[in-house]
Amino acid sequence: MSIFKDQFPRIGVSGQSTGYTIDQSIRFNDDDSGRMGRTPSSETNRRTWTFSAWVKRGNLDSSGNKFIFSRAEASKAAYIGFYQDDLTYAAAGGSLEVNLVTDRKFRDPSAWYHIVIAQDTTQAVSRERVRIYVNGVRETSFSSETYPSENYQGYFNTTSLHDIGVSRPSGSISGYFDGYMAEINFLDGYAYDPSYFGEFKENTDIWIPKEYTGSYGTNGFYITGSNSSALGEDFSGNDNDYTTGGLATHDQVLDSPTNNFVVMSSIDFTYDAIRNGNLETIGGNNNKGGRGTFGFSSGKFYWEMLATTVSDGYPGSGVVYDEFDPDMPAAYAGGGTNHGAGASHNQAIWYKQSSSGSTYGSIASSGDILQYAVDRDNNKIYWGVNGTYRNSGDPAGGSGAVASSLTHYGDWMPYVNHGSNAGSSAGTFNFGQDGTFEIGRASCRERV
């Protein structure tokens, strides 16, 4: 379990301080085949519906489809998702009947996107039959743009299986979504714009959520993830619960559109080296490393990493400045002017802005929880293992830092590297959104 200290706040917590709040999200890990599904008992309005959800992407595997919401069978299918990082809504029944693919890419792993797709095929103007919005703004530029015919009867709201986080055409499963979802609304018989679900924060262009208070229709649903033992529970009043697969209680996390946490950046890592909502990184004999999605230039912050597997001294970890090359090994995190500080765990050495370093205690082992307390205001970094700070560190009192007098004036960021010979190394981060470390190995947790 987590050993969070209280003297420093948790890194990355942000969001609105007043108004409507979203308390949690659901983490979908494609390696666990995370998904949920439901088969409606009756066919309802196939012409008119609205889908609304907040989405934060995990790994950025750009191959193929990553499905957010879908309905598929042997010859008829409809889906909302990402295709090579483009937001897409498509439907086909022997031929392609709807196909809207945005020009712009959605590749920011630090961002929550509010996606709204409203269909009303009774509209006389073709482009008004399907409207796509992201963060309150309508998408108008598409690389592919095929609208349904007037009074077209689509494939949502039929009596076939509907899925969240995956698609299952012809009984096979494909295109697992990887990342987080929150506030999943589906309205049966209503085509609403995003103002029903969100609003611009006063005097800004920042889109924030608000409570939906309207009707849902017969097959409508509202999934919040607030019940960790039944993440697909419907809170619309319809009891249209979705059955989950590959999801566990620890996949309810605090990361949300109104409380956005730092994760490790999937832009730095290849898609097969990062997983579990960008909180777990793994080695691949390629000297690959990465930074967190948020940096900080002032304040005091704390986070942890479970060293799931230590191999050849890795994962190395620490704090680096925002322009540091993430592929450089841990020693180089402190190997040049203004770089930051990094630990090589097979030697328990912290390097600080030079190629030399100081040794603090015994080496870190698989199963250890490594602690990082960073006082950016006073340019000090504290490092601990399993609840005890090395160098008799006292972050609250300001003594015993393993690195101090750092001079870089830009943003500092969390950092990890797996080395060139550490193919089995792995580390799981906790920036405050999930202190269970359930996504690490149980045998490791029992050691701390």
Regions found by a protein language model. Name each.
Residues 54-61, 117-122, 294-296, 304-310, ...:
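Solvent-exposed strand-to-loop "edge" motifs in beta-rich extracellular domains
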Residues 258-344:
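Conserved, ordered domain cores of eukaryotic regulatory proteins
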Residues 1-10, 35, 225-281:
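Short, tryptophan-glycine- and acidic/Ser/Thr-enriched carbohydrate-recognition patches
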Residues 53, 110-121, 132, 303-305, ...:
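Short tryptophan-centered beta-strand motifs in secreted/extracellular beta-sheet-rich domains
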Residues 139, 156, 160-161, 165, ...:
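Aromatic sugar-binding interfaces of carbohydrate-active proteins
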Residues 65-89, 316-350:
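Glycan-recognition/cleft segments
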Residues 2-191, 205-232, 388, 398-401:
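Extracellular glycan-associated modules
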Residues 45, 108-109, 297-298, 365-366:
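Surface-exposed loops/turns
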